[in-house]
From Swiss-Prot:
SUPFAM superfamilies: Cullin homology domain, Winged helix' DNA-binding domain. It is found in: Nucleus. This is Anaphase-promoting complex subunit 2. GO terms for cellular component: nucleus; spindle. Keywords: Cell cycle, Cell division, Mitosis, Nucleus, Ubl conjugation pathway. Pathway: Protein modification; protein ubiquitination. Highly expressed in immature flowers. Expressed in stems, leaves and flowers. The gene is APC2.
Length: 865
């Protein structure tokens, strides 16, 4: 618009000119047109140039300099559009339908040739433009002493020419050309990476060395290492020079951003492939430092050498065309190392490292489930992930991805509760290294906790995992004999020690450093859990949180401990004492008081048993069929402090019954006025059964022993008679007898009455090696326990509230779980008051539903109709 306005103004001047002046302008204008065409077409000589300059002088004399500029630039544009641009794009027409993997090596030659041709044409047009600029500058210098304005003329015209050139090419740009550039830089950078990594050096040495170097190498004047190093350097320089020439030519035609985007995307693609190659599926080795070293060795050295070749380090970002590159850098003494990194190289380094961190982070997050399964062997991968997240701050991506993996791979019906718990503990340990405060661990663990709360065996599995000797790992790793509880207590102690040191053993300088490193809690943090800097991950607390309260865990442990103690054949309780002491530290002495009393019962039982046996050694001799007290070992329980014990009637054989009576009498003598009340169905009995052809040993329950001992006097029994003698129901007898039948000791046959079966002792066992030395732990084999389970105890305790619940549902029709819970707490305040948790109530109501007393629909409980 500025040029057009200037032309209008100059045309008004023509009205004031004489006829001779107008005639001179007309002749000069015609000559100017003719000489412009000759110059641009390349058909002119020095005489034409002199004539052209004289015509420019004449037109400028009459104020028509803007006409000169506009017409010449428009003529250049038309010529370039018909010739240079069209010819340039024709080189790439053959690749419009090809995919990048079908380009082949010839595309490199085609690209270089096309750029060389268009650069030559551009240089010629610039030469023509320089003639115009020189003519305009000469006229202004003669008419004015303002040298600065004449320099501005040159900058202005060349800037307009460059814009015209770039816009002409961009408006005719084929869609596949950026892809061709990307492919070219990708191939060249892969070749460069192979050189820097030492691959393919031998093949390239002959091409890289000049004749003198080849002769020196052949004659032995150059050693092998020097030759390889020289070959690598020359190969690098040659490749960078070729790439630099392409980039320089692209810049010269206005494709600065396109070129930089092409080789930048190629660099990032190569870096991504390198990260994938180094990381792989090996989680036991840290790869972050190797990736950073590769970035320094290949991409940054290439960029430093490239920008130095392009002259950016000298001109500080100004190209020959006057455009500034955003990748400009300062000079470097050598391509092999950056002594003083420029601002451009520093920016590139930050970009590449961030991309590497993000790529490695995404790889590790995608495989986080496998990494945690292999923890702690996969600790290096966890440490890499931690550093990546600290750099990128994308913790939320980890949370979302890992929760999705958990729901798809772990929280399924096919996964056992034990496996889920072990994975949960490993998750806590691994993520604690990434997030010591546990902010993101809370979000990751929530789906696992919600899922486990819906499984009936969760409490039992947690207690078993805490107290067994596998170290809390599914594969049994860890210190032999160590329980997960011991491991967690050691971890907690180490965390507390670290915190203690931080709080009380820091000087003022360190305190200032700690204060300067303080960061606010992330937005995901729960403010109710305290500040991040004062919070630590409590694994045991997280396990307890699954259950709902520590009382439930302690009750389950009491049941499990009671079962273990009752099944012991000796008084070795060191492991149990150690576990109780650890639980006391975490849950308090009051919670574990009953467990301590149970252990003290075992200790007292051992002492009492020893005293009774000592007293029996001075007694009278044994009569026939009489059993010695030495064969009996008792466990004396303080019943009020033990969980409810399963009791069933059992009539023992006479000698055994007398032995128990004698033992009780001697206990009464020692512990007057206390008396023993035998639980005859509990305990274990060691038997040796002697047959005609062999002897067999078993360790069985008292009921099993009572059954087989009845066959000592009588070889055959009916089920009814045997049940009456032993004093147990027939259905209970059926379950126990199956054991002896399966061992080949008893045989079942049809009696005289077809409706009754007879059990007969097998005197001779044909399969002599079948069952020798076999033992039985009846509680585990038959699914029976000596102690009532927590569920059974809860059902018994909750029975008194069943009528209240039925009455509420009769009055209100249907009620939600929370409403039933709150109503019971409000009205059941008399002894016994309602003190159950929401989970316990839900478990009891589920039992009523299974008994078809209630229905559960749409989250509401109602009476079964």
């Amino acid at each position: 618009m500025e040029a057009l306005g200037s032309s209008d103004c100059n045309l008004e001047i023509l009205e004031t000119l004489s006829d001779d002046a107008i005639q001179e302008i007309t002749e000069s204008y015609d000559g100017f047109f003719t000489t412009v065409e000759s110059l641009i077409a390349g058909t002119g000589d020095s005489l034409v140039e002199d004539e052209f300059v004289s015509h420019v002088y004449c037109l400028c004399k009459y104020g028509l300099d803007s006409l000169v500029r506009d017409h010449f630039l428009r003529s250049l544009e038309q010529a370039f559009e018909k010739g240079g641009a069209s010819s340039f794009w024709q080189h790439f027409d053959a690749y419009s339908e090809k995919k990048h993997h079908n380009y082949g090596e010839e595309i490199q030659i085609v690209l270089c040739k096309a750029l060389e041709e268009i650069s030559i044409e551009k240089q010629y047009h610039e030469k023509c433009l320089s003639i115009v600029v020189h003519a305009l500058q000469s006229f202004k210098e003669q008419s004015s002493d303002d040298r600065q304005n004449s320099d501005t003329e040159r900058v202005h015209l060349f800037s307009r020419f460059q814009s015209m050139l770039s816009s002409t090419l961009m408006t005719t740009l084929p869609q596949h050309f950026p892809e061709i550039l990307h492919w070219y830089f990708k191939e060249r950078l892969e070749e460069l990476s192979a050189i820097m990594d030492g691959d393919g050096i031998e093949e390239q040495e002959d091409d890289c060395m000049d004749l003198d170097e080849k002769l020196r190498y052949k004659n032995g004047e150059m050693d092998v290492d020097e030759g390889c190093s020289q070959g690598k350097r020359l190969g690098h320089d040659k490749l960078v020079k070729n790439i630099g020439k392409v980039v320089r030519d692209l810049r010269s035609i206005g494709f600065t951003s396109m070129a930089e985007n092409a080789y930048a995307s190629a660099i990032f693609l190569l870096l991504k492939a390198k990260v994938h190659d180094l990381a792989g599926d090996d989680y036991r080795t840290s790869v972050l430092e190797s990736i950073k070293e590769w970035i320094q060795t290949v991409p940054l050295q290439f960029l430093n050498a490239l920008l130095s070749y392009l002259g950016d380090s000298v001109s500080y970002g100004t190209t020959s065309s006057g455009l500034t590159s955003p990748l400009a850098c300062c000079p470097s003494p050598s391509f092999s190392r950056v002594v003083t990194p420029s601002e451009g190289i520093v920016r590139w380094k930050l970009r590449l490292e961030y991309f590497a961190y993000e790529t490695l982070q995404d790889l590790r997050i995608a495989k986080l489930f496998e990494i945690i399964v292999d923890y702690p062997e996969s600790s290096p991968a966890i440490e890499d992930l931690k550093q990546c997240l600290e750099y990128t701050g994308q913790h939320s991506k980890l949370v979302e991805s890992f929760i999705s993996s958990l729901k798809y791979r772990l929280l399924t019906a096919g996964a056992s509760t034990n496996d889920i718990l072990h994975q949960y503990v490993s998750t806590i340990k691994a993520l604690r290294a990434i997030d010591p405060a546990g902010v993101f661990l809370e979000a990751v663990g929530e789906p696992i906790r919600d899922y486990l709360r819906g499984r009936k065996d969760t409490i039992k599995c947690i207690v078993t995992m805490l107290t067994d000797g596998s170290g809390g790992n599914a594969n049994g790793s860890g210190n032999p004999g160590d329980s997960l509880l011991e491991e967690l207590m050691r971890d907690e102690e180490s965390q507390e020690n670290v915190g203690f040191d931080d709080d009380f053993h820091t000087d003022d300088k360190q305190a200032w450093i700690n204060a300067s490193r303080w960061e606010p809690d992330p937005v995901e943090a729960d403010p109710l859990k305290g500040s991040l800097s004062q919070r630590k991950v409590d694994i045991l607390g997280m396990l307890v949180d699954i259950i709902g309260s520590k009382e439930q865990l302690v009750n389950e442990y009491r049941v499990m401990l009671a079962e273990k103690l009752l099944n012991k054949t000796d008084y070795d309780i060191d492991t149990e004492i150690r576990t109780v002491e650890l639980l006391k530290i975490h849950f308090g002495e009051a919670s574990m008081q009953r467990c301590e009393i149970m252990l003290n019962d075992l200790i007292d039982s051992k002492r009492v048993n020893t005293n009774i046996k000592k007293a029996s050694q001075t007694g009278a001799e044994l009569r026939e069929n009489e059993l010695s007290v030495d064969t009996l070992t008792s466990t004396i329980l303080s019943t009020n402090f033990w969980p409810p014990i399963q009791d069933e009637p059992l009539e023992l054989p006479g000698p055994v019954d007398k032995l128990l009576s004698d033992y009780a009498n001697r206990y009464h003598e020692i512990k007057t006025p206390r008396k023993l009340l035998w639980k005859k169905n509990l305990g274990t009995v060691k038997l040796e059964l002697q047959f005609e052809d062999r002897a067999m040993q078993f360790t069985v329950s008292p009921t099993h022993a009572a059954i087989i001992m009845q066959f000592q006097e009588k070889k055959s029994w009916t089920y009814k008679d045997l049940a009456e003698v032993i004093g147990i129901p027939i259905d209970a007898l059926n379950r126990r007898v199956n054991f002896w039948i399966s061992k080949g000791v008893l045989r079942e046959s049809t009696g005289a009455n077809s409706n009754s079966s007879v059990l007969t002792l097998v005197e001779s066992i044909t399969d002599s090696g079948k069952n020798e030395g076999e033992e039985l732990l009846t509680g585990e084999e038959e699914g029976e326990t000596s102690i009532a389970s927590v569920e059974d105890q809860l059902r018994k305790e909750m029975t008194i509230y069943e009528k209240f619940i039925m009455g509420m549902l009769t009055n209100f029709g249907s009620m939600a779980l929370e409403r039933i819970h709150n109503t019971l707490k409000m009205f059941c305040v008399a002894d016994p008051s309602y003190d159950k948790s929401l989970q316990q109530l839900q478990s009891f109501l589920s039992g009523l539903v299974s008994e078809e007393k209630l229905e559960f629909r749409d989250g509401m409980y109602l009476l079964k109709k």
